[in-house]
Amino acid sequence: MANSKQAKKRAGQSEKRRQHNASRRSMMRTLVKKVLAAIEAGDKEVATKELAAATPTLDRYASKGLIHKNKAARSKSRLNAAIKAL
């Protein structure tokens, strides 16, 4: 438990940041799942459209440090390869 005023403030800030990041991470995962669902359905046109929506989000969160830049690159690459294989 926080013993000082500064530690209490930092604990509150950390919790607020954790909730904010969890929301963003959830949104990002949902966008990726939409692409995967379109790929599973075999709908190349919808999958391409969904990937176009997910790509800037992955890049944005990689630049902000929410996910590692290599994870963003790997995700985009694998999704794109799966779409091309349709």
From Swiss-Prot:
The keyword Heme does not apply. One of its GO terms (cellular component) is small ribosomal subunit. It holds the Pfam family Ribosomal_S20p. GO terms for biological process: translation. This is Small ribosomal subunit protein bS20. It comes from the Bacteria. The lineage of its organism: Bacteria, Pseudomonadati, Pseudomonadota, Gammaproteobacteria, Alteromonadales. Residues 1-27 are annotated as: Disordered. One of its GO terms (molecular function) is structural constituent of ribosome. HAMAP family: Ribosomal_bS20. Binds directly to 16S ribosomal RNA. SUPFAM superfamilies: Ribosomal protein S20.
